[in-house]
């Protein structure tokens, strides 16, 4: 699917959808990440040229009677908007691909294992490798499955579902897998320089996704992912709070910072063409 445009008025957006339907073009409306707009998405990319031509006319005269007439032709000008925002389990599962759900469930299983077997027992199998364990390759990523409190795991898994889900849905399972592996290794290495192997959590991967999804949304919104700027600001605030230990929390600051850096760098690389195109306009 291709993102066509973001519109602040949902009713006008629906009128354009109805009008394009008279041309046998199906558009889908979705809420934007900032909550202030709705986005129109095209399912058949072979019709993109036609949509762009019609959209140019629509933006010049959105109140033209032909768009209202199309809504009447569709059946009812007052029909409900065609996007869904109900937060139920079916909706939540639809927003997450197989890798997102698998990692989410693995984290829950490992957390329950830690409650029954104890932190030390589980860490002896999954923690970041010490000097004699570097060939136990799973340890380079499984430290991300370790969580030491209910708040810790809930916070990380909410972010993982929100960011990992949209990344997997729009960019594919392979892209999410690469981001996860690279950021787990890089953030784990960064944290190990300060605390050895005594740490755990998905936070490094989460911060990598925050950086990746935010910058991709800013530079290439047509790719369908993004983080509202308010949430990005909150994430940076939390990063600063960790460094100053404002609430007396034990936070893996190096993992957060390392993850954010690697996520931003990966987004810069994946969206490098957008920077080149923008530079040509100066």
From Swiss-Prot:
GO terms for molecular function: serine-type endopeptidase activity. It catalyses: Cleaves type-1 transmembrane domains using a catalytic dyad composed of serine and histidine that are contributed by different transmembrane domains. The active site is at 203 (nucleophile), 256. The chain crosses the membrane at residues 96-116, 144-164, 176-196, 197-217, 225-242, 247-269. Its EC number is 3.4.21.105. The keyword Membrane applies. InterPro entries: GlpG_N_sf, Peptidase_S54_GlpG_N, Peptidase_S54_rhomboid_dom, Rhomboid-like_sf, Rhomboid_protease_GlpG. Its main location: membrane. Rhomboid-type serine protease that catalyzes intramembrane proteolysis. HAMAP family: Rhomboid_GlpG. NCBIfam families: PRK10907.1, rhombo_GlpG. This is Rhomboid protease GlpG. It comes from Photorhabdus laumondii subsp. laumondii (strain DSM 15139 / CIP 105565 / TT01) (Photorhabdus luminescens subsp. laumondii). The gene is glpG.
